């Protein structure tokens, strides 16, 4: 299997395994779906954190119907987005634990651990979040709640920073080695037929131009190189200081040397043999 390290810009996103015979068209669809799915989970978790702290969005006719299991605890939302009737501590922990598990499943740290992310993992994380919300809110959330809208794919991200991060599949491009992978080609047309190939692929929105090339050395390698040069510089400084004071160990610099010679005790050793 060919391993693709997916990035957007210089930021690592996830690892993805595929085959050299896969059409680029299918590859674009798969990678874009995973990328957007990860963004969706991040948005849901962000809203769920607010839900766990401050309950539903503002006071409306749904407040009496959508009551969290086990009752609520009033916790005022300082920014005024939610009504402040938060779930109790046990239900709050259900939401928080599920959020942690879902985010860990699709975390960017998976790439550091050499674990690939699949569309099934994205769906699993989404289902976990949906299940946790159903446990805490068995009557469901209001139709206008951002979390429910995300689950139903009715979210409105127009004019938001989150909306700028999303890449619609028709506008999605994949780049490798400064070249756009054309949808009519196969991956093997670019990387050859070696199934053990590992490459860095960058996802980009159409019209934004070619993404920047990868640096010759990674940030970690650059950090280690700078540390090496720093240590070497400190060693050279120490050697210079040692050379400056090395004459103090010379015989001619010993102020008592002449006195010992006159007394005839210059070569006497005091340590037992």
UniProtKB/Swiss-Prot annotation:
Q: What is its main location?
A: cytoplasm
User: What does the UniProt entry report for the null mutant?
Assistant: Morpholino knockdown of the protein results in loss of cilia-driven fluid flow along the anterior-posterior axis. Multiciliated cells show loss of coordinated cilium polarity with many cilia pointing towards the anterior instead of the posterior. The planar cell polarity (PCP) component prickle2 is uniformly distributed around the cell margin, instead of being asymmetrically localized to the posterior of the cell.
* A GO BP entry: regulation of cilium movement
* Superkingdom per UniProt: Eukaryota
Keywords, in A-Z order: Cell projection, Cilium, Cytoplasm, Cytoskeleton
Please provide, in alphabetical order, the Gene Ontology terms of the cellular component aspect for this entry: cilium; cytoplasm; cytoskeleton
Record keyword Cytoplasm present: yes
- Tell me the compartments it is located in: Cytoplasm; Cytoplasm, Cytoskeleton, Cilium basal body
Keyword Ligase on this protein?
Answer: no
Instruction: Write down a Pfam family by its short name.
Output: CFAP298
**So what family is this one in?**
Belongs to the CFAP298 family.
Q: What does this protein do?
A: Plays a role in motile cilium function, possibly by acting on outer dynein arm assembly. Seems to be important for initiation rather than maintenance of cilium motility. Required for correct positioning of the cilium at the apical cell surface, suggesting an additional role in the planar cell polarity (PCP) pathway. May suppress canonical Wnt signaling activity.
The protein in question is named Cilia- and flagella-associated protein 298-B
Q: Which organism is it from?
A: Xenopus laevis (African clawed frog)
């Amino acid at each position: 299997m060919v391993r693709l390290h997916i990035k957007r810009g210089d930021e690592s996103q996830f690892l993805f395994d595929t085959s050299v015979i896969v059409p680029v068209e299918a590859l674009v669809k798969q990678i874009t779906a995973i990328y957007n799915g990860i963004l969706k989970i991040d948005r849901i978790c962000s809203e769920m954190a607010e839900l766990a702290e401050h309950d539903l969005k503002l006071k409306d006719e749904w407040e009496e119907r959508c009551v969290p299991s086990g009752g609520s605890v009033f916790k005022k939302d300082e920014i005024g987005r939610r009504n402040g009737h938060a779930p109790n501590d046990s239900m709050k922990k259900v939401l928080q634990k599920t959020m942690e598990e879902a985010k860990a499943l699709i975390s960017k740290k998976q790439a550091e651990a050499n674990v690939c992310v699949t569309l099934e993992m994205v769906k699993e994380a989404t289902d976990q979040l949906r299940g946790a919300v159903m446990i805490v809110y068995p009557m469901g959330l209001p139709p206008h709640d951002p979390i429910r809208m995300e689950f139903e794919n009715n979210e409105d991200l127009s004019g938001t920073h989150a909306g700028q991060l999303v890449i619609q599949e028709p506008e999605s491009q994949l780049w490798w080695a400064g070249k756009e992978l054309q949808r009519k080609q196969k991956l093997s047309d670019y990387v050859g037929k070696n199934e053990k190939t590992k490459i860095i692929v960058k996802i980009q929105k159409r019209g934004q131009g070619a993404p920047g090339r990868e640096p010759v050395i990674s940030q970690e390698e650059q950090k280690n190189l700078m540390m090496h040069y720093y240590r070497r510089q400190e060693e050279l400084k120490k050697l210079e200081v040692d050379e400056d004071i090395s004459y103090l160990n010379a015989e001619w610099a010993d102020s008592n040397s002449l006195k010992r010679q006159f007394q005839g005790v210059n070569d006497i050793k005091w340590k037992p043999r």
